[in-house]
Amino acid sequence: MKRNIYVFAGESYMVRESFARLKASLDIQMEELNVTVFSEMPPADQLIETCAAVPFLSPVRLVAVRDCTALTAAGDKDEAKKIADYLERLPDTTVLALCVAEAPDKRRTLYKRAAELGTVREFPEPNPAGCVSFVAEQAKKQGARIGRVAAQLLVDLVGCDYYALANEVAKLAVYTGGREITAEDIN
């Protein structure tokens, strides 16, 4: 049976967006008491203690580690093993999200156990063709349109950085006021 365990790994923008979508999909009340986000890897005992806490006036609590080095080769193996051993006992009322902005080490016990019990989403580093598609998707989200040539020009100028591309598309969408974004707007 799948548990409430999520691993988001790889390209940082996609990891952050996936985490944000997960958080938005949960029915969390009193968020300040039922959401704990560690910016870096806490000691295993602290993470386990946080996960074991009962949600307060909410059906679920969210515990997340933004830079889960325990999933990488650089992480502490003993700490990772403690967490891996705990995953099977994770309460049904706790959602655990382990995020890392690089490729995880699939040989790690923690990765294997999380993949077995939960959901793993890996996001490879973007390629230029993927970035052009990303620009088109972002324009659509902003209520704008952009042609393939203009999208390619934007990728050529900005580079294949999802954060920078999303920011530039948002600015262009405001600038164009709903009309199609053209190469002239970008230059």
PLM features per residue range, with description:
Residues 1-187:
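Conserved beta/loop motifs at nucleotide-recognition and modification sites
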